[in-house]
Design a protein with these regions (language model features):
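Charged, glycine-rich active-site and insertion segments that engage polyanionic ligands
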Residues: 1-76, 80-154
């Protein structure tokens, strides 16, 4: 993998910059997570492949969604969702330029209302983690919620 001047792999640097919302300290913290690019890709994969409620069970044992990795996954998912909203409104606002084509393609399967509601749901589930709600329950509720919102906001 190519490395940037900071010694961070280019894919991680790009993902970290997208996830950090302009905060350098946060970008450095995120870029030290070697699994960040994988987590970002996994968020896109899950949104692409979550089609029906029976699909939820197949993601419950995903290592990207386990207790230790879930906060980073929620960050990556938030960025993907924000970029999907940008793809529907103003493509110049997409932050994850390295995944622009995938994000634009993925966004076609969601309405703008659905994306906004799913982003809200992600933040609600993030709050539950801070109240020590079990990660499996958070993941299950999140994935089922995504399906429900996507269906209701067609």
């Amino acid at each position: 993998a190519a490395r940037s001047r900071s010694g961070v792999a280019d894919g991680n640097a790009t993902s970290a910059a997208a996830c950090a919302d302009g905060m350098l300290w946060r970008a450095k913290e995120i870029s030290s997570n070697s699994a960040l690019s994988e987590t970002f890709d996994r968020a896109i994969f899950i949104l692409n492949n979550l089609k029906k409620s029976s699909d939820v069970a197949s993601f419950l044992n995903d290592k990207t969604l386990d207790k230790d990795n879930l906060p980073v996954f929620l960050d990556a998912l938030s960025i993907v969702l924000r970029d999907m909203i940008a793809a529907k409104t103003d493509k110049n606002l997409i932050m994850s330029k390295h995944k622009e084509w995938e994000i634009e393609t993925l966004s076609k399967g969601f309405s703008l209302d659905a994306l906004s509601n799913i982003l809200y749901l992600v933040n609600e589930e993030r709050k539950k983690l801070s109240f020590y709600v079990g990660s499996t329950g958070v993941v299950e509720n999140l994935l089922l919620g995504i399906l429900e919102v996507k269906y209701k906001c067609q």
